Amino acid sequence: YAAAIEDANTNNTKEKTLLVNRPVENTPVEASDLAVAVHGSGTDLCILSYGNGYYLSRQAEKELAEKGIECRVVDLRWLAPLDESGIIEQAQACKKVLIVDECRKTGSISEAIMTLLYENATNSANAVQRLCAHDSFIPLGSAAYHVLPSKEDIVNIASEMCLTNTKAESKA
């Protein structure tokens, strides 16, 4: 949306099905402000996400705080082009990074973000994990919850990453 305003071009918009009919904040988008949106200032964990993954990450943020994990949730806001400098800046400010992506693990935007972080951020390789949907068709209705990331998945992986020394396994 913001890029369409900036370029004054017609663009196709994809909307996450699980976000339909969810309340949203009505904040005006300035064409000159196309940076990532950062919520929180914790340094234990940076959660990078967008769409419904962002919504679930904000829910998980509350449970993680109860476990003593201070995190920040970064809303990517748009995927092309990525705000690479904003992503790197937020990742470097934290000890660990979790990328939450509702797309399938293979070929998702999380691959580009992982590459960006490995090439440019100072976090060690085991400090960056991703949580993605299974490599399968995404079913409709309640069956979708068997293959898509959930708030519980985010809390579990984030807890493993921050409270233990073992490398968390991503879903899929």
Model-identified regions with their sequence ranges:
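Basic phosphate/pyrophosphate-binding loop/patch that engages nucleotide-derived ligands
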Residues: 6-7
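Thiamine diphosphate
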Residues: 2, 11-12, 16-172
